[in-house]
Amino acid sequence: MHALQAKILDPRLGRDFPLPEYATPGSAGLDLRAMLQQDTVLEPGQTLLIPTGLAIHIADPTLAALVLPRSGLGHKHGIVLGNLVGLIDSDYQGELMVSCWNRGQSAFTIAVGERIAQLMLVPVVQARFELVDSFDSSDRGAGGFGHSGSH
């Protein structure tokens, strides 16, 4: 398991609410919580930037973190991430913030301490462009946007 440097910015985190943790031994993401000052209503179509009370520094340039939505919030309530996926670079050291967007038809209350997203560490492979005049041919070629499927 990798070590991840973290600073608690909201004293309720770790005291009143658990620190981010894996829900099961097979979980890929650590749950992030809404460290709001009070319960907040997210109206249909509204986007809100929500603090997690936690700053991290991954430090290892071969790793990054993704902030991903929680499937139940999106499927049952229409609450998804405003930026769809958040990318946290290894050299970022600020507070993790979650952009929540209510794409549903009903207002939704985000409770203080509610699990609103998940953080997943992923490997990073950096590349440099190698400029060429042409590519070796492939079965797919330049086909895209549904080219390989039936719909």
Curated annotation (Swiss-Prot):
Annotated InterPro entries? dUTPase, dUTPase-like, dUTPase-like_sf, dUTPase_trimeric
Q: What does this protein do?
A: This enzyme is involved in nucleotide metabolism: it produces dUMP, the immediate precursor of thymidine nucleotides and it decreases the intracellular concentration of dUTP so that uracil cannot be incorporated into DNA.
This protein's UniProt keywords: Hydrolase, Magnesium, Metal-binding, Nucleotide metabolism
Reaction(s) catalysed (UniProt annotation): dUTP + H2O = dUMP + diphosphate + H(+)
Q: Which EC numbers does the record give?
A: 3.6.1.23
Q: Which NCBIfam families match?
A: dut, PRK00601.1
Residue sites binding substrate per the record = 70-72, 83, 87-89, 97
Q: In which family does this protein belong, per the annotation?
A: Belongs to the dUTPase family.
User: What is its EC class?
Assistant: hydrolase
Q: Which prosthetic group or cofactor does it need?
A: Mg(2+)
Q: Which GO terms describe its molecular function?
A: dUTP diphosphatase activity; magnesium ion binding
Database matches in Pfam families: dUTPase
Give the GO biological process terms: dUMP biosynthetic process; dUTP catabolic process
Domain of life, per UniProt, equals Bacteria
Pathway where it operates: Pyrimidine metabolism; dUMP biosynthesis; dUMP from dCTP (dUTP route): step 2/2
Q: Which named protein is this?
A: Deoxyuridine 5'-triphosphate nucleotidohydrolase
